[in-house]
UniProtKB/Swiss-Prot annotation:
It catalyses: Endonucleolytic cleavage to 5'-phosphomonoester. Residues 72-260 form the RNase H type-2 domain. Belongs to the RNase HII family. The gene is rnhB. Its cofactor is Mn(2+); Mg(2+). InterPro entries: RNase_HII, RNase_HII/HIII, RNase_HII/HIII_dom, RNaseH-like_sf, RNaseH_sf. It comes from Streptococcus equi subsp. zooepidemicus (strain MGCS10565). This is Ribonuclease HII. Manganese or magnesium. Binds 1 divalent metal ion per monomer in the absence of substrate. May bind a second metal ion after substrate binding.
Length: 260
């Protein structure tokens, strides 16, 4: 064993996919520090992979229970954009195949923005159906953000497109909808349900793209970076350039600005 270079050992370790692989036991006899460091590194990597696989499997708990009850087209629903001062609220409805997991999927707020697009594309490839609901700032001002959220979610259900476009059960992130479909509201569902997490990413990427377009139409507010949230740059833009057609006039400080 000692005849093998550490470089060659590292290459072979990369091919090891199980913590019970006998190669680890063989390497115990090799006392070289570089070898033992490589072994520890590979074991940590495998432990991280197992932990991630277990997390993803746990995110199918709600879906698996529903499959056992006979439901087939289970849709996850989530929204993005309740808090911003500008732009629409966007909801997505996603139906995934039975037992489908998507690498790296989680609540969109817990995923680095650089990874959003790749996960979004993976969802687009695997999903049986995807629907979007987009409610603009004018409607938000007219009905309030809570009601606008429900409108966006219902629109997303109605806009489902794909090989499966009629869900027989809804898993919704912390909301109940007045639709004739069995449903369950799950607190923090975007972190505990694969279907809701998929909807979270689809809604997030869709809204971010819209805000990029708005950044070009209304420069000076930082919409490309802040997505309409009330950052320092955004508030400075409001002070310097005023209110745009996409600002929510029922939200402060815009509401007070309209009264001056």
């Amino acid at each position: 064993m000692t005849a093998m270079t550490i470089k060659d050992l590292k290459v072979r370790l990369e091919a090891v996919s199980s913590l019970s692989d006998p190669f680890f036991e063989e390497l115990k006899a090799d006392k070289r520090l570089g070898v033992q460091k490589a072994v520890s590194s590979r074991k940590r990597a495998l432990e991280a992979i197992l932990k991630e696989e277990a997390r993803l499997e746990a995110m199918l708990t709600y879906e698996q229970a529903l499959y056992q009850k006979g439901f087939q087209a289970i849709a996850g629903i989530d929204e993005v954009g309740r808090g911003p001062l500008a732009g629409p609220i966007v909801a997505a409805c996603v139906i995934l195949p039975k037992g489908c997991t998507i690498k790296g999927l989680n609540d969109s707020k817990k995923i680095p923005k650089a990874k959003h697009e790749a996960i979004y594309q993976a969802i687009q490839k695997k999903a049986l159906g995807i629907g979007l609901g987009i409610i603009d700032n004018h409607t938000i001002d007219r009905v309030n953000i809570y009601e606008a959220t429900k409108l966006a979610m219902i629109a997303a259900i109605n806009q489902l497109k794909g090989s499966v476009s009629k869900p027989d059960y809804l898993l919704i992130d912390a909301m109940t909808l007045e639709v004739p479909i069995p449903q369950q509201a799950i607190i923090k569902g975007d972190a505990s349900s694969m279907s809701i997490a998929a909807a979270s990413i689809v809604a997030k990427v869709t809204r971010d793209r819209l805000m990029l377009d708005y950044d070009k139409a209304f420069p000076g507010y930082g919409f490309a970076k802040n997505a309409g949230y009330g950052t320092k740059e955004h508030l400075q833009g409001l002070h310097q350039y005023g209110i745009t057609p996409i600002h929510r006039q029922s939200f402060e400080p815009i509401k007070s600005m309209t009264l001056r």
